[in-house]
From Swiss-Prot:
It is found in: Cell membrane. This is Potassium-transporting ATPase KdpC subunit. Part of the high-affinity ATP-driven potassium transport (or Kdp) system, which catalyzes the hydrolysis of ATP coupled with the electrogenic transport of potassium into the cytoplasm. This subunit acts as a catalytic chaperone that increases the ATP-binding affinity of the ATP-hydrolyzing subunit KdpB by the formation of a transient KdpB/KdpC/ATP ternary complex. The chain crosses the membrane at residues 10-30.
């Protein structure tokens, strides 16, 4: 009988520790010391939430930087979202897959050797909010033309928002860069 009582007590103590106290402690630590990160790293502009630093968005206007292609279309298809819920992930297609090749041709004019790899391929999560500085600099002339500013001004904006990669190329956050474009004075 003593063994059963000890087992029940240990089970209750473990449930309280692991199911209540530990999650409560982690939540409190997150909210006190890492409030921005614990709440999605949301970005506000003009007093409204426009996105997250951590999730890419689908940009199509010529006056904005375009992010990487997304294998999950940044969850922008409402019908798929309703049926499948929010998801992330790569396509898991091989380099010879005809659907992948067709998608790459859609994102890039094939035969153009002036395209960076991140402009043609999706990230592993399919939601990457960053592009390489090289990719951003190659988009700068298009954006400068659309906004009627010099390419060097757009390039300076890119350089000021550059983040250093440890084992990767330098990169920029597309949403933050596009907000900076909108804030740019003529």
């Amino acid at each position: 009988m003593n063994t059963i009582r000890n087992s029940i007590c240990l089970t209750i103590i473990t449930m309280v520790l692991c199911g209540f106290l530990f999650p409560l402690a982690i939540t409190l630590i997150g909210q006190i010391f890492f409030y921005q990160q614990a709440n999605g790293s949301l970005i506000t502009y003009d007093n409204r939430i426009v996105g997250s630093k951590l999730i890419g968005q689908h940009w199509t206007e010529t006056r904005y930087f375009h992010g990487r292609p997304s294998a999950v279309d940044y969850n922008m298809n409402p019908e798929k979202l309703y049926k499948n819920g929010v998801s992330s992930g790569g396509s898991n297609e091989s380099n010879g897959n005809t659907e992948l090749i067709a998608r790459m041709k859609h994102h890039v004019k094939f035969g153009n050797s002036n395209v960076t790899i991140d402009a043609a391929t999706s990230s592993e999560s399919g939601l990457d909010p960053h592009i390489t500085v090289e990719n951003a600099l190659k988009q700068a002339p298009r954006i400068a033309d659309a906004r009627h500013v010099s390419t060097s001004r757009v390039a300076d904006l890119i350089q000021h928002r550059k983040q250093r990669g440890v084992l990767t190329n330098d990169y920029v956050n597309v949403l933050e860069l596009n907000i900076a474009l909108d804030k740019m004075k003529d």
